[in-house]
């Protein structure tokens, strides 16, 4: 059984027991979160596709960790000027473990 849900402007295909890295959620480690915007649920041959969401379906998850991703470097070179500008960015994320899918 797996489901596709939406969080942080992205869609994630998950199954029970899977650990997923999402955009930062303002939750503490160990808290439970429910995602109601489930777009599709598949259980063997039984497929439920929402328009746009499956009514009554939800994905339940537990927050495992909060953290920051790898650094992304942004470099802007100005040709023939011996000048450049560097900038870095580390995006915050939340890791959640999927504990249940209810359809």
UniProtKB/Swiss-Prot annotation:
User: Known InterPro entries for this protein?
Assistant: bL21-like, bL21-like_sf, Ribosomal_bL21, Ribosomal_bL21_CS
Q: Which cysteines are joined by disulfide bonds?
A: none
Q: Which residues form a coiled coil?
A: none
Does this entry carry the keyword rRNA processing?
no
Taxonomically, the superkingdom here is: Bacteria
Which GO terms of the molecular function aspect are on file? Answer: rRNA binding; structural constituent of ribosome
Keywords, A to Z, come to:
Ribonucleoprotein, Ribosomal protein, RNA-binding, rRNA-binding
Q: Does the keyword Nucleotide-binding apply?
A: no
Record GO cellular component, one term:
ribonucleoprotein complex
Q: Name one GO biological process term.
A: translation
Query: Which protein family is it in?
Result: Belongs to the bacterial ribosomal protein bL21 family.
Binding partners and assembly: Part of the 50S ribosomal subunit. Contacts protein L20.
The record's function comment reads: This protein binds to 23S rRNA in the presence of protein L20.
Query: What's the protein here called?
Result: Large ribosomal subunit protein bL21
Which gene does this sequence derive from? rplU
